[in-house]
């Protein structure tokens, strides 16, 4: 409009000059042709200006700016080019100025009408243009920065899952905004700069106006004439891309799979083989079960086979090393009446409690495989009822356990305490060890077959009983030893009942022994134990400790651990030397009942002597250093009856016995340093008594016995043959044997200054009958302070000897 005003002003000025200067009529006629040309030029200029304005308006609607032509330059160039003509025809133009003004007005009206028509045409033509853009040019939208929005949005949807969720949510909100005719703008919440950039680009993609609020953190979008909804949603692009990617990945995975290659190769090599992938779930489960059963069955079979293989290997070793006892078998844990095998409750270490001569099964806990002569094993009766066997390596390293560990069943504990016996031997080549199993039981059960007692090797022709020494003083002459279970007396090898007939010279010496024991009341009587009554014989015996026939094993459940001095024995023992073990005694021990004839005899032994009684109850009290352990239910009374009358059945009435008080210290512990012990099984070639196994106290542990406030106990192991009943050969005075020649007092010297016994020694008497050839019999006193052990009569020729060692040993 400013340009038109300038033109009008110029025309008005020209008209003014024409009015002032009057011209002749012929001049006016000459210039009419020129005036028409000028009018045409003016019309062309106005039309060009109008078109430029229309273009600028339409470009502003599209967001583009176009520069209009410079009119001043053309207007300035026109007067310069036509200056000559103007000067020549000024008078003509001035004459026709009035007509020109009228024409200009009509032209302006026409131009305004044309402008209005053009605007209406532009408005009607914009709608089809938008439709054409949404259909044909949807892929051609670009941002103000020149970024292709379609490509940017597709890449963002593919690559970033977080941006994908933002774009999908934003798309839904914008579509809802466009569909809502009531709202003309929408304000997004405050967000980060990256998210605002996404909003700007999505709004531009939808043809919306997008700006930022005053804070600069929120985007406001407005509807425009170019607002559109794209035909293809964002989720459609995702579906297409996901389908393509998944197909590509699947193909690559199939091609690059090494498992599939191996399967394909195997299938090519074996075309009739079923493919691994074609197996169903049921087939896979069946195959898994088969493999599982095979594996676990193999383990159980191997564990059981290893036990028997090792047992057989040990048996072969013992047969090779000991040629004189090739036919003797290793004792394994018997199966109980229910046919229960030893695999369920029996560990492999319990079956490994057997060793061959000079060769013990190697244990993984051995620190030195060459150290075979180890210290005694120790059986521990813990509160849980298990029995652990520990083997000492040497006298100095008491903390190193190199033996097997053996544990009995959990049912072996009882209120009175469980008890067991140790079985550890290392015999030389000349003899077979007496090994007893670990046994512990609760009342009313037979635990030895169930707990799996370790293997025992013993001569088949001898067995041993440990009896208190006090029984020798309380048994009246002419008494017969009866079997408490059968009621039958023990018989000699010739079939005659075994009659106990001590010599007359033993009576005064017996009283002398009692006198010596009474000379030390402070050490014998300071801590008396409660009196223990006689337990009735139980029908079941627990823990056979000697390998004999079944009737023997079920009746006598004792074992002894003999202790051998380390180097002070006057004569090397004929039996093997082994470490002995110290076993805490349970609350009760096997009781020995002596029924005398009618005569009154004083209470013998080394405990405090009580009033004269006709019957004596000899029951060892608990002791921490026990060599014989018997479960509480396995009470085994031994009855002595005078000669001439004895019961022949188990219905014979037995009188109750009077209790005898014993002194023992349960809390005393036995030192493990430098303890040597010896199992001395006696080699026999004849029936009858084969010998005596004794226990000798080493000088290192003598102070333990002497320091205890009780009476040191000497025990003797009496051997008896395996016959229909226990045969204890006794002698009678009527046989006319020169008994005084076989009875020699044996002094038991103790170390001076220890205060338990006088240094002069303690006499021990032997009453032995000579029906059978002589054998090596050893009578060795142990360190057990619980009770005393009688010297039983043995059927062999004797030579009594004395020892100067701590402890005592008798050789026959």
Swiss-Prot record:
UniProt-recorded name of the protein: cAMP-regulated phosphoprotein 21
CDD domains referenced in this protein's UniProt entry, alphabetically: R3H_encore_like
Expression sites (tissue/organ): Isoform 2 is expressed in brain. Isoform 1 is present in immature thymocytes (at protein level).
Ranges of compositional bias, category Low complexity: 9-25, 90-100, 339-349, 391-423
Residue numbers carrying Phosphoserine: 33, 56, 134, 300, 363, 383, 562
Record's compositionally biased regions (Basic and acidic residues): 40-53, 102-130, 351-360
N-acetylserine: residues carrying this PTM: 2
Residue intervals of the SUZ domain: 228-300
Domain R3H: 164-227
Region (Disordered): 1-130, 246-281, 332-436, 485-544, 561-632
Entries under Pfam families matching the protein: R3H (PF01424), SUZ (PF12752)
Bias kind Pro residues: ranges: 619-632
Subunit structure: Interacts with CALM1.
Record keywords, A-Z: Acetylation, Calmodulin-binding, Coiled coil, Cytoplasm, Methylation, Phosphoprotein
Subcellular localization: Cytoplasm
Gene Ontology terms for molecular function: calmodulin binding; nucleic acid binding
Entry function: Isoform 2 may act as a competitive inhibitor of calmodulin-dependent enzymes such as calcineurin in neurons.
Coiled coil: 32-58
Modified residues (Asymmetric dimethylarginine): 655
Species the sequence originates in: Homo sapiens
GO terms under cellular component: cytoplasm
Modification after translation: Phosphorylation at Ser-56 favors interaction with CALM1. Isoform 1 is methylated by CARM1 at Arg-655 in immature thymocytes.
InterPro entries: R3H_dom, R3H_dom_sf, R3H_domain_containing, SUZ
Start-end of Polar residues biased regions: 361-373, 582-602
Origin organism lineage: Eukaryota, Metazoa, Chordata, Craniata, Vertebrata
Gene name for this UniProt entry: ARPP21
């Amino acid at each position: 409009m400013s340009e038109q005003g300038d033109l009008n002003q110029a025309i008005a000025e020209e008209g003014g000059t024409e009015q002032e200067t009057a011209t002749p009529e012929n001049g006016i006629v000459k210039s009419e042709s020129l005036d028409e040309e000028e009018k045409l030029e003016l019309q062309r200029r106005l039309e060009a200006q109008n078109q430029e304005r229309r273009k600028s308006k339409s470009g502003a609607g599209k967001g583009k700016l176009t520069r209009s032509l410079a009119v001043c330059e053309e207007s300035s160039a026109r007067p310069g080019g036509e200056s000559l003509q103007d000067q020549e025809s000024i008078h003509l133009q001035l004459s026709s100025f009035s007509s020109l003004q009228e024409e200009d007005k009509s032209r302006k009206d026409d131009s305004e009408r044309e402008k209005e028509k053009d605007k209406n045409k532009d408005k009607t033509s914009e709608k089809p243009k938008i439709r054409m853009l949404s259909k044909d040019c949807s892929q051609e939208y670009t941002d103000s920065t020149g970024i292709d929005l379609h490509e940017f949005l597709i890449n963002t949807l593919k690559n970033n899952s977080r941006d994908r969720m933002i774009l999908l949510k934003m798309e839904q909100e914008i579509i809802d905004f466009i569909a809502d005719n009531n709202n003309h703008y929408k304000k997004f919440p405050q967000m980060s700069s990256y998210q605002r950039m996404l909003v700007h680009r999505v709004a531009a993609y939808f043809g919306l106006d997008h700006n930022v609020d005053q804070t600069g953190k929120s985007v406001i979008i407005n509807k425009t004439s170019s607002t559109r909804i794209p035909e293809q949603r964002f989720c459609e692009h995702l579906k297409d891309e996901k389908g393509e990617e998944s197909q590509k990945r699947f193909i690559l995975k199939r091609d690059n799979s090494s498992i599939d290659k191996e399967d394909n190769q195997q299938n090519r090599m074996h075309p009739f083989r079923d493919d691994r992938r074609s197996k169903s779930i049921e087939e896979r489960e069946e195959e898994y079960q088969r493999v599982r059963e095979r594996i676990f069955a193999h383990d159980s079979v191997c564990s059981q086979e290893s036990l028997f293989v090792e047992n057989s290997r040990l048996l072969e070793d013992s047969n090779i090393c000991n040629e004189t006892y090739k036919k003797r078998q290793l004792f394994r844990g018997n199966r109980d009446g229910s046919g229960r095998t030893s695999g369920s409750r029996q560990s492999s270490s319990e079956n490994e409690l057997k060793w061959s001569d000079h060769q013990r099964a190697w244990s993984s806990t051995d620190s030195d495989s060459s150290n075979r002569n180890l210290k005694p094993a120790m059986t521990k009766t813990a509160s849980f009822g298990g029995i652990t066997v520990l083997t000492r390596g040497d006298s100095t390293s008491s903390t190193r356990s190199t033996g097997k560990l053996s544990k009995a069943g959990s049912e072996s504990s009882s209120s009175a305490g469980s008890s067991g016996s140790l079985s550890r031997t290392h015999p030389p080549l000349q003899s077979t060890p007496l090994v007893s199993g670990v046994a512990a039981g609760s009342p009313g059960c037979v635990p030895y077959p169930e707990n799996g007692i370790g293997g025992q090797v013993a001569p088949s022709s001898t067995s041993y009983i440990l009896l208190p020494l006090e029984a020798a003083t309380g048994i009246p002459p002419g008494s017969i030893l009866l079997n408490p279970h059968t009621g039958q007396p023990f018989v000699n090898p010739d079939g005659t009942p075994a009659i106990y007939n001590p010599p007359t010279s033993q009576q005064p010496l017996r009283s002398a022994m009692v006198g010596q024991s009474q000379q030390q009341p402070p050490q014998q009587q300071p801590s008396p134990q409660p009196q223990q009554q006689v337990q009735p014989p139980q029908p079941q015996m627990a823990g056979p400790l000697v390998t004999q026939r079944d009737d023997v094993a079920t009746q006598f459940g004792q074992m002894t651990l003999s202790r051998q001095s380390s180097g002070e024995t006057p004569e090397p023992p004929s039996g093997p030397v082994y470490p002995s073990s110290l076993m805490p005694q349970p609350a009760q021990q096997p009781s020995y009942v002596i029924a005398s004839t009618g005569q009154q005899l004083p209470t013998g032994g080394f405990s405090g002597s009580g009033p004269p009684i006709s019957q004596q109850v000899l029951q060892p009290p608990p002791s921490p250093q026990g060599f014989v352990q018997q479960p509480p239910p396995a009470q085994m009374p031994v009855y002595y009856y005078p000669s001439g009358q004895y019961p022949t059945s188990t219905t014979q009435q037995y009188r109750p016995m009077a209790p005898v008080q014993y002194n023992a210290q349960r809390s005393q512990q036995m030192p493990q340093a430098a303890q040597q012990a010896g199992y001395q099984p006696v080699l026999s070639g004849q029936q009858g008594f084969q010998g005596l196994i004794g226990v000798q106290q080493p000088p290192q542990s003598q102070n333990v016995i002497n320091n205890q406030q009780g009476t040191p106990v000497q025990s003797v192991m009496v051997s008896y043959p395996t016959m229909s009943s226990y045969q204890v050969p006794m002698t009678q005075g009527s046989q006319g044997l020169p008994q005084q020649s076989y009875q020699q007092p044996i002094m038991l010297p103790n170390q001076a200054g220890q205060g338990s016994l006088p240094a002069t020694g303690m006499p021990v008497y032997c009453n032995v009958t000579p029906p059978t050839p002589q054998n090596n019999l050893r009578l060795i006193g142990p360190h057990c302070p619980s009770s005393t052990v009688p010297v039983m009569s043995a059927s062999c020729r004797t030579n009594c000897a004395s020892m100067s060692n701590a402890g005592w040993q008798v050789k026959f």
